[in-house]
Amino acid sequence: MVTVVDRVTSRRLRHPEKMHRPDTSIQKKPDWIRVKAPTSKIYKETYDIVRAHKLVTVCEEAGCPNVGECWSQRHASFMILGEICTRACAFCNVATGIPLAVDDNEPERVADAVAQMELKHVVITSVDRDDLADGGAQHFAKVIYAIRRKAPKTTIEVLTPDFRHKDGALEIVVAAKPDVFNHNLETVPSKYLKVRPGARYFHSIRLLQRVKELDPTIFTKSGIMVGLGEERNEILQLMDDLRSADVDFMTIGQYLQPTRKHHPVIRFFPPEEFESFAKIGKVKGFLHMASNPLTRSSHHAGDDFAILQKARDEKFALQR
């Protein structure tokens, strides 16, 4: 059977690689997942700044439930290197396909927006760019340098892909000295083949460990979603794996199914279970844990950075 698509009148399929998958039912969200629709004046101003600079945000592309709250506080996470990803993770709402050429003017536009919004802390992330020799590492570095020039008081957090098969890429990003280096594991290793087939769990662990080896002053961070069918003991083992890589900060949030073609939600974790993970994480030695149903990597990132700084200072004081 051949499907003919009218390229003039039809929108590009956002997830062509998922079209062969059977539809799955989307469960009704429990009350603790509900969020208010964005309505504030500041939300509109943030939206206008993003559009004026022709930028992409992961807040919109990934369908983040916290976009109303964050944008109303002038918090935005910029997604560089385009809006088309070369991978097809079963949980992700970012479009998959063949990316466009890298926009060489993007670093300056991002820096201009950061300065205009007077951000204290900014998160820079990207799609996977397996098509690029360095996976986009040099572009990450250019964005960091541009922000340092135009908004020197802003602290910078990067949320990077895994740079798999990209020798030297990680070193380029670390040399640009972001304040926080985040790379998400996303899920437990037993779910990788189905949920994150283009990645490798222990490669991601090693990536985070290598950041600390290259520059111990950079905070490291990683996060997962729960509700994909993982077992509790797998989550606890993952925490241990992150601590063995000297990761400072972990986030845990509830997976929410974007469309019927995406991986279904197997279970909604209640708030008290997230609280339990947060307590366990602190005992295991993380400087900070953010664990609740609506936690996302960039949610409250600025506040979390301040907590990280304080926790590290207190840890060093005890060691003297």
Curated annotation (Swiss-Prot):
Q: In which pathway does it act?
A: Protein modification; protein lipoylation via endogenous pathway; protein N(6)-(lipoyl)lysine from octanoyl-[acyl-carrier-protein]: step 2/2
- Cofactor note (record): Binds 2 [4Fe-4S] clusters per subunit. One cluster is coordinated with 3 cysteines and an exchangeable S-adenosyl-L-methionine.
User: What is the species listed in this Swiss-Prot or TrEMBL entry?
Assistant: Bartonella quintana (strain Toulouse)
Q: Give the SMART domains listed for this entry.
A: Elp3
Give UniProt keywords alphabetically. Answer: 4Fe-4S, Cytoplasm, Iron, Iron-sulfur, Metal-binding, S-adenosyl-L-methionine, Transferase
Tell me the protein's name. Answer: Lipoyl synthase
Q: What is the enzyme's class at the highest EC level?
A: transferase
- The residue ranges crossing the membrane are none
Q: Which residues bind [4Fe-4S] cluster 1?
A: C59, C64, C70, S298
InterPro entries from the UniProt entry: Aldolase_TIM, Elp3/MiaA/NifB-like_rSAM, Lipoyl_synth, rSAM
Main subcellular location: cytoplasm
**What reaction does this catalyse?**
[[Fe-S] cluster scaffold protein carrying a second [4Fe-4S](2+) cluster] + N(6)-octanoyl-L-lysyl-[protein] + 2 oxidized [2Fe-2S]-[ferredoxin] + 2 S-adenosyl-L-methionine + 4 H(+) = [[Fe-S] cluster scaffold protein] + N(6)-[(R)-dihydrolipoyl]-L-lysyl-[protein] + 4 Fe(3+) + 2 hydrogen sulfide + 2 5'-deoxyadenosine + 2 L-methionine + 2 reduced [2Fe-2S]-[ferredoxin]
Instruction: Give cofactor(s), names only.
Output: [4Fe-4S] cluster
Family in the record: Belongs to the radical SAM superfamily. Lipoyl synthase family.
Binding-site residues, [4Fe-4S] cluster 2: C85, C89, C92
Q: Where in the cell is it found?
A: Cytoplasm
| GO MF assignments | 4 iron, 4 sulfur cluster binding; lipoate synthase activity; metal ion binding
HAMAP family reported for this sequence: Lipoyl_synth (MF_00206)
Which cellular component terms (GO) are annotated to the entry? cytoplasm
Q: Where is this region: Disordered?
A: 1-26
* Pfam assignment, any one: Radical_SAM
Could you tell me the EC number(s) of this protein? 2.8.1.8
Positions of the Radical SAM core domain: 71-287
Q: Which SUPFAM superfamilies match?
A: Radical SAM enzymes (SSF102114)
